[in-house]
Amino acid sequence: MPKIIELPEVLANQIAAGEVVERPASVVKELVENAIDAGSTQITIEVEESGLSKIQITDNGEGMAQADVAMSLRRHATSKIKNQGDLFRIRTLGFRGEALPSIASISHLTIVTAADGEVYGTKLVAKGGEIESQDPISTPVGTKITVENLFYNTPARLKYMKSLQAELAHIVDVVNRLSLAHPEVAFTLLNDGRQLTQTSGTGDLRQAIAGIYGLTTAKKMVEISNSDLDFEVSGYVSLPELTRANRNYITILINGRYIKNFLLNRAIFDGYGSKLMVGRFPIAVIDIQIDPYLADVNVHPTKQEVRISKEKELMALIKSAIAQSLREQDLIPDALENLAKSSTRGATRSVQTSLPLKQTNLYYDSSRNDFFVTPETVQEDIKPLVSKSESSVSLVANKQQPTVKQAKRSADDSDSEHGKLDYKNKSKLKRMLENLTNEETSTFPELEFFGQMHGTYLFAQGQGGLYIIDQHAAQERVKYEYYREKIGVVDSSLQQLLVPYLFEFSGSDYISLQEKMPLLNQVCIYLEPYGNNTFILREHPIWMKEEEIESAVYEMCDMLLLTNEVSVKTYRAELAIMMSCKRSIKANHALDDYSARDLLVQLAQCKNPYNCPHGRPVLVNFTKSDMEKMFRRIQENHTSLRDLGKY
C-alpha cells in the first residue's frame, strides 16, 4: 500500500499559512498588497481587537469577475504571472497565489467584489478554506475582504500571539511602510472604529513622511537622487542631527516593495560617514527603481528578502546620493533652538506653538490638528523667534491661554569611550546590574587637586601618592548613585510645568509605548495621549532638572522600545546607568579649580568611587615608591652570577 499521498488542498493551505501568515499584520500586508496590485487609489483597513477578531480591507480597485472569485481561493491561482518568463519580470507585489487561500484556511472569510462592466457583484463566504456560499450582490466596483476569527482552527498559533497593543503596533508599522511605498494611494487605518492613520494619496512622498512621522521630522528630511543605467535611487533622509535609537525608521523600497537588506542599510550609514553618532540611526525612505530582471523576489515566503544583481553598484549609488545631498546642506544645528532652551521659558515658548492645552482621546482628533499637510506647509522655513520685547507683549496678552512646547530630540551626546548600553545583551547587562547591586561602601583617600590634562584627566595628590582621575568616569559614578537613589526609591513629588511638553512618535512606537506606560509611571513620568501619535507631559519629578526633560523623556522611551520584557527594578537600574552617562561631562572639557575640587568631594561621598557603572576604573594611583622607581631613585637589587651559582 503506498505511503506517500498528496495532501488535501485545505491542509496544504494551512501548512502554507504557517509561513505566509505569522500574525494579523501579515494578513493586512497580503490583502493590502493585492488591493494595490488591483489599481486601487483608496484603501481602508478596519480591524477589531488588533485584527484577531476582525480585519476588513476595502478598496476601489478593478475588482474580480464572478467567475474568478471562487478560483481566487485555489492554491497557486493568480492573475499576476502566466509563464516562466513572467517570473523574472515581476512588477506586482503578489504573484504566487498563496496568500488568499492560506488566509481563508485559518479564518472565516467573506469576499464582496464587483468588476467594471458587470451588472452584479459577487459575495462569497468561506470557512476554514471551504466555500459555504456564493451569491450575486449589488455593490460598487472594487473589493471588500473580511477576515474574522483568525487562527480559530490553529490554537497553537493563537496561543503565542503577543498582547493586543503589540499586534496593533505591527499592523500600524505595515500600513506605514506601505504608505511610504505608495504615496499615490490614500490609506485609512481604523482600530475598533477609531482612526489611527490616514494619508492623502497625493503622490508626494514628503507629505506621506509628514503624515507618518510628523511635520517636525519632515522638515528635517533632505531629498536624495541618483541613477545609472541599471538603478534609479530617490527618497529622503534625515539630517544628522535627527536620529533614532534603532533601525526601525529606515525604509528601503524596491519597485514599490518594502524589503530588508543589511548591505543596503550599510550603504545608508556609509553615506553619512562620520556624521552619525555611535549607536544612532537616521530616518530614511529610499525608493529604488530597478529592472525586475536584476531582482529575485521569490526567495522568501513574505517576499521581504530580495536578491539583487549588481548589489555593490547599487550600494555605491545610495552612498554617493546621500553623501552628495548632505554636502549641499547646512549641517550646523539651528542655534536659535539652543538659545530658546537657555532663555526665559515663558517668553520664548509662548510663540512657538498655538496648540490648545486640553485633554483628548487616544487617537487622532481631526478637530485639533489638520492631518493633511500641504507641500507649502512642509517646505516652509521655521520662523525666527520674535524679539524679547515682542515676546514679553505676547506673554502678557496670552497669559490666559496656556500653550504647549513641542519637545525636540537633542543630538546624541553619548560618550564613545564608554560605549552604549546593549539592552538586548541580557547576560552582560545582568552581570553589570549584579555587580552594581553588590557594591560595598569603601573608604576614599583625601585628595588635593592641583591640575588637569587635555581637559580629560584630573591630577590630585594624597598620602598614597599621585592620583589621576578620569573626569567623565568620576562624574558618571556620582550621577549614577544620585539617579539610582532618586529612581530606585522614587520620590513621588512632582513639579507642575508652566508650559507642558509634546512628545511625538511614529504610529507603531506610539502604540507600543501605551502598553509600556506603567514602567514610565513607576519613575514618575506621566505621559498622556494627546492625539496624532503625540503624548503630553504636564509635570515632572522634582529630581529631574527642567532643562533635561526633553532629552531624558525621549531617552527613557527609546530604552523601553528597545526592550521586550523588563522588570521595574531592572528598568530603574538601566535608566540610572543611561542617564548618568548621558548627563556627565565629556573628554576635552576644561574644568575650573572649583568645579574640579567639588567633583572630587562628591566622588569621595560615593558608595563605590573606584569604578564607573560600566565597570571601568575612575582613577589610578602612583605611589611615591612607584615614582621613585620610574626615575630610578630606587633600583632593584642585582643578583650576582656568584650568587646564582649557589642554586
From Swiss-Prot:
Stretch list, region Disordered: 393-423
Gene Ontology CC annotations of this record: mismatch repair complex
Matches recorded under SUPFAM superfamilies: ATPase domain of HSP90 chaperone/DNA topoisomerase II/histidine kinase (SSF55874), DNA mismatch repair protein MutL (SSF118116), Ribosomal protein S5 domain 2-like (SSF54211)
UniProt-listed SMART domains: DNA_mis_repair, MutL_C
Listed InterPro entries: DNA_mismatch_repair_CS, DNA_mismatch_repair_MutL, DNA_mismatch_S5_2-like, HATPase_C_sf, MutL/Mlh/PMS, MutL/Mlh/Pms-like, MutL_C, MutL_C_dimsub
GO MF annotation: an example: mismatched DNA binding
GO BP of this protein: mismatch repair
Cited Pfam families: DNA_mis_repair, HATPase_c_3, MutL_C
Keyword tags: DNA damage, DNA repair
Record field: transmembrane: none
Annotated Basic and acidic residues bias: 409-423
NCBIfam families (UniProt xref): mutl, PRK00095.1-3
Function per UniProt: This protein is involved in the repair of mismatches in DNA. It is required for dam-dependent methyl-directed DNA mismatch repair. May act as a 'molecular matchmaker', a protein that promotes the formation of a stable complex between two or more DNA-binding proteins in an ATP-dependent manner without itself being part of a final effector complex.
Family named by the database record: Belongs to the DNA mismatch repair MutL/HexB family.
Protein name, UniProt field: DNA mismatch repair protein MutL
Gene: mutL
